[in-house]
């Protein structure tokens, strides 16, 4: 980079960036390498789909401001951001070593994980640097919100930096800075999410990052988060109802864990305490005995960067469909292409694409990327140059269902709930689904037992949609959204083996009441009637 170009400000014109290979993707974003021609520097651009984020731009601007003021050797440098059509482009430093997740996948694919994926010294070295970054954020009043191996990046010199601080991590928790709303959107799987973030009862603070850090420690040793095999609703239920996970949770071959010692396991258990007040701070963790095993960045260069996939191996080339408007879509073979949103395969453009053996597009599904949706639209616009300004669309969230008005006598009758995403695609929309009749028994605000009867039609209704409508009708406390939805999902997935479940409510008990599962004080019972 020349002296003249280094003095230039970072451009907010998309034409100044030559987009190159896709180097990462998630539920709402794609990361591409790019070359900034005025600066003569290669960068990473995270392209966030604003249609899926359901967050006001006022709140996003606050997060961007926080990112721009963040300067630390263990935090990825943020350069600038701007809006292109319905995407927010975040321009950041490119770290050529890729993410720790890339390395984990590479090691597992080569079958080199039979005695654990990364050794203790490597894990300690990486996580010590992550803690340094987290300590900086927490001291400055920031919460990362999305600590995981996929967001820990490596430089070619063995340096370790945390990515996704700010906007994209902010979106992953629903974009609610105040933490005082019942409904939010969780993007992606909540495997790394702290219990208090899931419950959304009392809000959360930087200790949520410490829980995620503990899950990440397990991920670096075993190759995956403890509940990675389960769908999102099941992950929520397991995290909230079970004891905290450990190194062994979900691991079939316990032999692979033998080399991990007591100090590593103790450090994990300290992080994974359900009561956030009992978790250590980042500064306290840095003094833990386990981190005495940490080495320098040259050690990482030697131990894992030489085993890591190259940027070309990680990258997915982008195919360009002739005449396309320039929107990225993932194809079934794992590649990426530029094309129009409404792609007509009978058109000249479509025939040209097919003649080039273009892969079919992957059909998008909300079920694994959005659990709970807000009903409010995206807010004010981000002010950007006219040529790249974008009118953001309405929220893609669930529309409220129509419920028959009900009172709360001992046997309140609830009309069948018309949940969001009422018609599923494929065969399910053509077959007649048999509704499941259910009864939710719990105490109302007057401490009287009530039976709330309703029907759930598989393929039409969703557990989260039904739970939201029970709350909207005033039948269920808003704080119990997650736990009711999780147990409803449990029953409808396996109605034969789960005809009745009793579970603890997040709303708890009042005053001097003592929780009692048999009397349903602080508990609820959901049954097939």
Curated annotation (Swiss-Prot):
Modification(s) after translation: Phosphorylation at Thr-185 by WNK kinases (WNK1, WNK2, WNK3 or WNK4) is required for activation. Autophosphorylated; promoting its activity.
Description of how activity is regulated: Activated following phosphorylation by WNK kinases (WNK1, WNK2, WNK3 or WNK4).
Encoding gene (name): OXSR1
Catalytic activity annotation: L-seryl-[protein] + ATP = O-phospho-L-seryl-[protein] + ADP + H(+); L-threonyl-[protein] + ATP = O-phospho-L-threonyl-[protein] + ADP + H(+)
GO cellular component terms given for this protein: cytoplasm; cytosol
Species: Sus scrofa (Pig)
Residues that hold ATP according to the record: 23-31, 46
Keywords: Acetylation, ATP-binding, Cytoplasm, Kinase, Magnesium, Metal-binding, Nucleotide-binding, Phosphoprotein, Serine/threonine-protein kinase, Transferase
Pfam family for this entry, one: OSR1_C
Annotated segments matching region Disordered: 315-360
N-acetylserine PTM sites in chain numbering: 2
EC number: 2.7.11.1
Record-given protein name: Serine/threonine-protein kinase OSR1
Residues with Phosphothreonine modification: 185, 310
EC category: transferase
InterPro entries, sorted: Kinase-like_dom_sf, Kinase_OSR1/WNK_CCT, Prot_kinase_dom, Protein_kinase_ATP_BS, STE20/SPS1-PAK
Sites of Phosphoserine modification: 324-325, 339, 347, 359, 429
Subcellular location: Cytoplasm
Required cofactor(s): Mg(2+)
GO terms of biological process kind: cellular hyperosmotic response; intracellular signal transduction; positive regulation of T cell chemotaxis; protein autophosphorylation; protein phosphorylation
Functional description taken from the UniProt entry: Effector serine/threonine-protein kinase component of the WNK-SPAK/OSR1 kinase cascade, which is involved in various processes, such as ion transport, response to hypertonic stress and blood pressure. Specifically recognizes and binds proteins with a RFXV motif. Acts downstream of WNK kinases (WNK1, WNK2, WNK3 or WNK4): following activation by WNK kinases, catalyzes phosphorylation of ion cotransporters, such as SLC12A1/NKCC2, SLC12A2/NKCC1, SLC12A3/NCC, SLC12A5/KCC2 or SLC12A6/KCC3, regulating their activity.
Residue spans of biased composition, Acidic residues class: 334-348
């Amino acid at each position: 980079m020349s002296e003249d170009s280094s003095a230039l400000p970072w451009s907010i014109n998309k034409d100044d960036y030559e987009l190159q290979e896709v180097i990462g993707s998630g539920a709402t974003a794609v990361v591409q390498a790019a070359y900034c021609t005025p600066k003569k520097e290669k960068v990473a651009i995270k392209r966030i789909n604003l249609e899926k984020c359901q967050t006001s731009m006022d709140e996003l601007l606050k997060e961007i401001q926080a990112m721009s003021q963040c300067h630390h050797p263990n935090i990825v440098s943020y350069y600038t951001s701007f809006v292109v059509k319905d995407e927010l482009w975040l321009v950041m430093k490119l770290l050529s070593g890729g993410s720790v997740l890339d390395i984990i996948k590479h090691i597992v694919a080569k079958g080199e994980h039979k005695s654990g994926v990364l050794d203790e010294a490597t894990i300690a070295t990486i996580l010590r640097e992550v803690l340094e970054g987290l300590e900086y954020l927490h001291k400055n009043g920031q919460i990362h919100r999305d600590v995981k191996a996929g967001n820990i990046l490596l430089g070619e010199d063995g340096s370790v930096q945390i990515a996704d601080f700010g906007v994209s991590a902010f979106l992953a928790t629903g974009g609610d800075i105040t933490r005082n709303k019942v409904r939010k959107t969780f993007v992606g799987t909540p495997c790394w999410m702290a219990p208090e973030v899931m419950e959304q009862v009392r809000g959360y603070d930087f200790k949520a990052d410490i829980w995620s850090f503990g899950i990440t420690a397990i991920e670096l040793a075993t190759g995956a988060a403890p509940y990675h095999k389960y769908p999102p609703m099941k992950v929520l239920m397991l995290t909230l109802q079970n004891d905290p996970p450990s190194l062994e949770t979900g691991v079939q071959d316990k032999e692979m864990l033998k080399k991990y010692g007591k100090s590593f396991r103790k450090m994990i258990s300290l992080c994974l305490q359900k009561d956030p007040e009992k978790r250590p701070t980042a500064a306290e963790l840095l003094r833990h005995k386990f981190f005495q095993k940490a080495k320098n960045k040259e050690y990482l260069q030697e131990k894992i960067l030489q085993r890591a996939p190259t940027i070309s191996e990680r990258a997915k080339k982008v195919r360009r469909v002739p005449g396309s408007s320039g929107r990225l879509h993932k194809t079934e073979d794992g590649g990426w292409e530029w094309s129009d949103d409404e792609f007509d395969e009978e058109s000249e453009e479509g025939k040209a694409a097919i003649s080039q053996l273009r892969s079919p597009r992957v059909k998008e599904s909300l079920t694994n990327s959005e659990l709970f949706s807000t009903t409010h639209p995206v807010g004010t616009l981000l002010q950007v140059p006219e040529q790249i300004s974008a009118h953001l669309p309405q929220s893609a969230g669930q529309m409220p269902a129509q419920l028959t008005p009900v009172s709360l006598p001992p046997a309140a009758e609830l009309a069948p709930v018309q949940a969001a995403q009422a018609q599923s695609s494929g065969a399910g929309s053509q077959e007649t689904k048999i509704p499941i009749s259910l009864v939710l028994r719990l105490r109302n605000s007057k401490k009287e037992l009530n039976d709330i009867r309703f029907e759930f039609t598989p393929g039409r209704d969703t557990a989260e949609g039904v739970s939201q409508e029970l709350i909207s009708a005033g039948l269920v406390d808003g704080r119990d959204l997650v736990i009711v939805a999780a147990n409803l999902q449990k029953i409808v997935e396996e109605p034969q083996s789960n005809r009745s479940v009793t579970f603890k409510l997040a709303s708890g008990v009042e005053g001097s009441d003592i929780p009692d599962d048999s009397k349903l004080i602080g508990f609820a019972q959901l049954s097939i009637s």
